[in-house]
A protein has these predicted regions:
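Extended ligand-binding regions for polar small-molecule ligands
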Residues: 33, 74-82, 155, 160-161, ...
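Beta->alpha turn/N-cap motifs
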Residues: 52-56, 97-102, 111-123, 147, ...
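Periplasmic-binding protein-like
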Residues: 54, 137-145, 220-257, 279-304, ...
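Acidic, polar ligand-binding/catalytic clefts
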Residues: 77, 88-156, 297-307
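A ligand-binding cleft/hinge motif common to bilobed small-molecule-binding domains
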Residues: 103, 117-128, 173-180, 199-202, ...
Length: 312
């Protein structure tokens, strides 16, 4: 498969073999005259466009050579392989298009980008504008604290000073938990994630409440990564991340869903997760040390595109 602008030199060796995907659009196969929507466009142009993020570690970001890498980016490359096989193409050019939080939905909706590979939350509001494939990650609100403090559960935080970033759902959640569970917390707002983590680092707060994957990245990037622990207990239900594609394009979604379901249920899916969340990653070799949670294991064993946290 050929990569377009900002292309990676070669596909990862771990790319799912086309034959392993075994995807068809029905008994008669994907003949050109039967195709509609995105599949028709890809067949006619010989191109698929992947949207990537520049700094959504470890999902989709630029490495030291300014090339897109990441967990979600690898999944999108595997989807592209499945599409190539399904359409019986000898060559498929993968074009790479940068997206941001602001541009990702419009660029999917207007046809510029076919797959958005990042850390996009699948929720009901977004489903009115775009579609999502099977969930590839679940985040939840947790807290990071120094291991030496032994703050293993939310109850252990009683009477402590904690910090969260102002204007986030996370600070609202810790305020609600404080009231509901009579924790007697002092809750400080920080202007951004870096300031909040620094408050834990310097002892001005016992814990920082935020999305667990962001906490993992901050801890891994700190001066002493081994000095911090992220709570196993969560303050929120799991929030699913999914790869976006165009709404109301059932044939394309069927190919994408089958490709991701096969990947997630296979041993390779687990290896892919572990590569990006439990091992050193480029460019600085940080290790997020975020093993697969029980809800995440369930999301891989029974793939779902549901936006409902209760589904996980």
């Amino acid at each position: 498969m050929h990569f377009g602008h900002h292309r990676s030199a070669a596909l990862s060796a771990a790319v799912v073999l086309a034959s392993a995907m075994g995807i068809t659009l029905g008994a008669s196969g994907a003949n050109a005259q039967e195709l509609t929507g995105t599949l028709k466009k890809i067949k006619e142009t010989g191109e698929i466009t992947i949207g990537y993020r520049d700094a959504s570690v470890p999902f989709s970001y630029l490495d030291g050579d300014q090339k897109p890498v990441g967990y979600a980016f690898e999944i999108c490359k595997k989807i592209a392989e499945a599409v190539k096989t399904n359409l019986k193409l000898t060559k498929l050019e993968v074009k790479l298009n940068p997206v941001t939080s602001a541009t990702r939905i419009p660029l999917i909706a207007n046809g510029t980008v076919d797959l958005e590979c990042g850390s996009t939350t699948n929720n009901v509001d977004r489903q009115k504008q775009v579609a999502f494939t099977n969930t590839h990650f679940l985040t939840a609100t947790r807290y990071v604290a120094k291991k030496s403090a032994k703050l293993d559960t939310i109850e252990d935080l009683k009477g402590k000073t904690v910090v969260s970033t102002s204007g986030t759902t996370n600070i609202r959640q810790i305020n609600e938990a404080n009231t509901a569970r009579s924790l007697g917390l002092t809750i400080l707002p920080a202007k951004d994630h870096a300031e909040a983590f620094l408050m834990v680092e310097t002892g001005r707060a016992a814990a920082f409440v935020m999305d667990d994957v962001l906490l993992a990245s901050l801890a891994a990037s700190s001066k002493e990564p081994g000095a911090y622990a992220i709570s196993t207990e969560a303050l929120s239900k799991p929030e699913p991340y999914g790869i976006m594609l165009r709404k109301d394009d059932a044939p394309f979604k069927a190919v994408v869903d089958e490709a991701t379901a096969k990947l997630y249920k296979s041993p390779e899916g687990k290896v892919l997760y572990e590569t990006w969340f439990t091992k050193p990653i480029p460019p600085r070799g940080i290790n997020l040390s975020l093993p697969m949670s029980d809800p995440m294991k369930k999301a891989f064993e029974s793939p779902s595109d549901s936006a409902d946290p209760a589904a996980y």
